[in-house]
Design a protein with these regions (language model features):
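Short, Lys/Arg-rich, polar N-terminal cytosolic tail immediately upstream
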Residues: 1-18
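Cytoplasmic membrane-interface segments at the C-terminal ends of transmembrane helices
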Residues: 13-24, 48, 87-105, 124-131, ...
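Alpha-helical transmembrane segments of integral membrane proteins
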Residues: 19, 23-31, 72, 76-80, ...
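Hydrophobic alpha-helical membrane-insertion segments
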Residues: 28-44, 106-124
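Interfacial/capping segments of alpha-helical transmembrane domains
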Residues: 38-57
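Perimembrane loop-to-helix junctions flanking transmembrane segments
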Residues: 51-70, 138-140
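Juxtamembrane non-transmembrane "cap" segments at the membrane-aqueous interface
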Residues: 51-54, 116-139
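Hydrophobic alpha-helical transmembrane segments
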Residues: 69-84, 142-165
Length: 193
């Protein structure tokens, strides 16, 4: 085995290409995560809230522990996450992944997880100050609608999974279309018997 020359160029990624990849990843992630803002307000506006009764200043109990409002709030979060994932997956694929490849796809999926976290934070804090104020100043026996809380934290993965699904299906569709065109060309070029 011959010794390698120290001055010989190394194969692999250069610093400028790493910076470019980091920029693509960061831009894809940030652009996708920002989509969690309207989703959070949408979840806060659409999801039903649990009815609670003030027990004393600052404390409350759930009026109906068997209420379906918990499940409905989680369902709304998951539906908004799937819709957000499908939308950002399609737009992200068309605007970034086709041109920038796997780095943009990874950024988009990381950003989708960020968007789900932003949606959760905004939705849970939507109306929280008003609820706390009412809870602190209402007499015992008053019924209030509580702020949202996601019970099924697994709902956070719906957005990134939907985005990853769209990217994978889009890439497979593009590649299979390319393969079918190549196959048709090879059949057209082959001599007929």
């Amino acid at each position: 085995m011959e010794p390698q020359d120290a001055a010989a160029p190394r194969s692999g990624l250069s610093l400028p290409s790493l910076r470019a990849a980091a920029g693509v990843f960061g831009a894809s992630a940030a652009a996708t995560a920002v989509c969690g803002i309207p989703a959070g307000f949408l979840w806060g506006a659409l999801a039903p809230r649990v009815l609670v009764r003030v027990v004393s200043k600052g404390t409350a109990e759930i009026v109906q522990p068997e209420t379906s409002a918990f499940i409905a709030a989680d369902l709304w979060f998951c539906l908004i996450g799937v819709a957000g994932g499908l939308l950002t997956g399609v737009l992200g694929y068309l605007l970034a992944v086709r041109r920038r490849g796997p780095t943009a796809a990874a950024g988009l999926i990381a950003g989708a997880l960020g968007a789900a976290a932003v949606t959760l934070w905004l939705g849970e804090n939507y109306g929280l100050a008003g609820f706390r104020h009412q809870l602190a100043h209402s007499p015992p026996g008053t019924q209030l609608h509580a702020s949202l809380a996601l019970g099924a934290t697994g709902g956070l993965v719906f957005w990134p999974l939907a985005a990853a699904f769209v990217i994978a299906v889009s890439e497979l569709a593009v590649r299979s279309r390319g393969w079918s065109h190549a196959l048709a060309r090879s059949r057209a070029d082959s001599p007929r018997r």
